[in-house]
Swiss-Prot record:
GO terms under biological process: spore germination
Transmembrane segments: 289-309, 323-343, 353-373, 375-395, 410-430
PANTHER family: LEUCINE ZIPPER PROTEIN 4, SPORE GERMINATION PROTEIN
Compartments reported by the entry: Cell membrane
Pfam families given in the database record: GerA
Protein name, entry field: Spore germination protein B1
Described purpose of this protein according to its UniProt entry: Involved in the response to the germinative mixture of L-asparagine, glucose, fructose and potassium ions (AGFK). Cannot stimulate germination in the absence of gerD and gerK gene products (fructose and glucose receptors respectively).
Topology versus the membrane: Multi-pass membrane protein
Keywords: Cell membrane, Germination, Membrane, Transmembrane, Transmembrane helix
Annotated organism of origin: Bacillus subtilis (strain 168)
Species classification: Bacteria, Bacillati, Bacillota, Bacilli, Bacillales
Amino acid sequence: MQIDSDLQNNLDTLKKTLGQNDDMMFYTFAFGDSRQKACLLYIDGLTENKMLAQYVISPLQKEALAHKECSIEDLSAFFFGFHHSVVSTMKEIEQLVFSGQAILLADGYRGGLAFDTKSVATRSLDEPSSEVVERGPKIGFIEKLRTNTALLRERTSDPNLVIKEMTLGKRTKKKIAVAYIQDIAPDYVVKEVFKRLKSVNIDNLPESGTLEQLIEDEPFSIFPTILSTERPDRVESSLLEGRVSILVDGTPFALIVPATVDEFIHSPDDYSQRWIPMSLVRLLRYSSILITIYLPGLYISLVSFHTGLLPTRMAISIAGSRLNVPFPPFVEAFIMIFTIELIREAGLRLPKPIGQTIGLIGGVVIGQAAVQAQIVSALMVIVVSVTALASFTVPSYAYNFPLRIIRIGVMISATALGMYGVIMVYLFVIGHLMRLKSFGQDYIIPIMAQPGQDLKDTVIRIPTMFLKRRPTRNDPEDNIRQR
């Protein structure tokens, strides 16, 4: 329905659809020499009243309009310098007013003006809680989309940085922003991102995690194929490598596509520290992943099937420690891993000081009590504890879950088939990873199949002076980053 030039007719129509809301405000006033009637529509609490008074009402009342104008564009000229747009239908008014904008309707004007006076409580910029680095920027994204895009603009002063906005959610009308560098990001990736976003048909988009599940390549895989981050510097570096970022209003977590398995293991401060220690740290992380997945399964297979592979003294020591334990190795390991997962989850849900105390005291007390009660052996406590510690070295929290799930599968296979079961799970996981795609790009590439340039920044990192080209696996338009 089009907006009529008669103000009273417009208000009668709007009050039928919006008037049942107690926080819906209809502020009427007069302006100009002819004292034309006007009305401001806004949601109390979503709109900054001082901005309305200073930038909307005051300029109108100061202008000496002698007669009614015939075009809403003429009225729009009085608000030069203040962000606003022209609306022409009642449906537009309903959508914009509930998103926090104020609508100006004036008698004699066929149309209205929408002013961006949204006022939403937000927190100040702070260090990301989920991606703490020893050296690097200490500022993370917040829940306000415009602040997040400004942080990107501030860090990337490249005129080729493109930020396009769109609205998702049939009812909530959630704003999202897609960021990419035009002369670096491959066109086919950008087109694929917009294609998937436009295919999303949902009532509400509460968080970027929901969007991630709607546009990912492999919804039935346990491995994430989209990287999420709170750090503007990480988004910046990804954009400069030819990736695309998606930011959602109301959440501090940005999405980065396409993502490879390396991205979940690397940390932002890998590039702010010297290359030798950081290369060793990366090797430590990759080793920790293997320990997280395979150590309990290897222990079970060696104790249950392949004791001949152990040194004689070690085999005797293990047998002695398990002499009075009533459970087989798998049950031992499962009890301890289940207990550690309980402690981990309790530590996350409880207030931070209490959670840290529960994690420390709970692990020590329960482990000691289990050994003294001869429910588990002391060596099993050591194995499970080392496994849990190794899992904490993975920078990506989302990548921890698949590793822990695979660990249970390795334990079951080791219990049934020994070392052959461990090898079978290993081959299955590698095959599954090689099958995965992330927005048309391979999720994992065998080391021997990677170009030499990409090998310089995978398991280890060579000096920055030699990283002159962008990773070819991202297929960037501009391949040179250092001349």
